[in-house]
């Protein structure tokens, strides 16, 4: 069995780790960084860029550069939060064929699972490059408050990327694993996870290798992206007041504002003030306009105060569900890049009445925890038991549109529960089972996960047929539902696929597309390497010919020039094999050139060596005689 890797698929950055010598190790990517921007771009040449290369060209290619796609995964296009995001990003969010929110880039529509799969492929390649072997199994993290549709979409992304996802693990739980792996004493901890796009809070009890989640809560649309948006809105408003121009209508300006906002936010974690300086941000009839604005830490804290306060409501709910008070928490573990912000730490400290634990790297700890879980599944990590929970209540719609809970939130998973229901009308021969997830009392106010029909019920008065509905939640938090007519034994079962979601056919097509992209990427890389090698050899050989001039035999010179011309012709095309073949042929001829040069030098040395030796010997004799005469004279 090959290595199982742990991947933190983040909104802003992603990270991959693996177990080595009993400890999780974060793997550096090709650019030498330990985290990779979760950004995918498509150039006008249809080239796909992932990570730092994609981020570098975002300003000049904003419409085709996709970031923060995790906020769209498993979401419907008509979802109010999707609508809000549509106005804030420079790329296009469109309605997928299944009604989900998709993105448009490079003239093509992509599902969020596909874009996430491209990022996962990059993580997979990073691990394979380090390990020197193929990797096809992974543990992937998701926000604890992700619903079933979002978890399933993340699992689909893994499949599209060519990975078997052994486990979907909650991010705060993964962080707790990394934090508590070497701690055996019993502790109650809170994991406060404020990342790039989501917020989670989990309360856990840790002791003797058992990690038991007591409660979890969160907000899947609250994170660093929202902090950036506040700064962008502030800068745009200030500029509009001064110049009368609305920068939010200009996609290029919006992307520049976003990058400046993120930079300012990071700088204000260590500095009291920072200057945003964006020359030539736009222009009007009077000429070019520049944006120059100084932002203080106090100003930033004022802008985002409501966002930080929003994190406290889920914290209070999680504590109440766990049956503990803030004072009962032994350690508060801070996770996610946004927890570096001094104001966030201050608010958490005031709420819990203790200094938060900052001994873990907030950007890497989740991937490390995923690697530990991978080690547990592989059998490399012993005596660790992870007991996670389902974040939201699950149930079905019953008479009057009421949401009837079958499994309450914060139930330890995996779990299974059955309940018997009946028909609402006389002689009803079919029932529709509509499955919902959420905490509201009416079904319509919760998230519809899916529905299916149980048909062939024998005619009977209402209330007589006995229909047993069974909910089964696996360790990934993914739901299976079945309905069985106890009278006839007829059964209908579904693995919940969101009312949108990707079908098996969609996934298979996307797997093939991803493989094609991988093949295209490989071809581009091989072509670039071949052209570099060919170009370099042509340059070296031509320089040698120039330096040697008439010293080269005419026949050899003609042969070398012909080989150089053949490589130059091949370099104009895209055929890797042809370029390599002609480069190799030039290499053989260039060796003859080097050999001829060496033989020529050797011949020249032999021709000049003899007279010099004789002259040197003669000089010695004269010196000796001269010395002797001198001595005699002195006598």
Swiss-Prot record:
Biased composition (Basic and acidic residues): 604-618
Keyword Phosphoprotein in annotation: yes
Modification Phosphothreonine occurs at: 198
PROSITE patterns: HSP70_1 (PS00297), HSP70_2 (PS00329), HSP70_3 (PS01036)
Domain of life the protein comes from: Bacteria
GO terms for MF: ATP binding; ATP-dependent protein folding chaperone; unfolded protein binding
Signal peptide residue numbers: none
Induction trigger: By stress conditions e.g. heat shock.
Keyword terms, alphabetized: ATP-binding, Chaperone, Nucleotide-binding, Phosphoprotein, Stress response
KW Chaperone (keyword) present: yes
Matching InterPro entries: ATPase_NBD, Chaperone_DnaK, Heat_shock_70_CS, HSP70_C_sf, HSP70_peptide-bd_sf, Hsp_70_fam
A Pfam family hit: HSP70
Biased composition, class Acidic residues, residue ranges: 620-635
Region (Disordered): 597-635
Family membership: Belongs to the heat shock protein 70 family.
Function recorded in the entry: Acts as a chaperone.
Designated name of the protein: Chaperone protein DnaK
Source organism per UniProt: Zymomonas mobilis subsp. mobilis (strain ATCC 31821 / ZM4 / CP4)
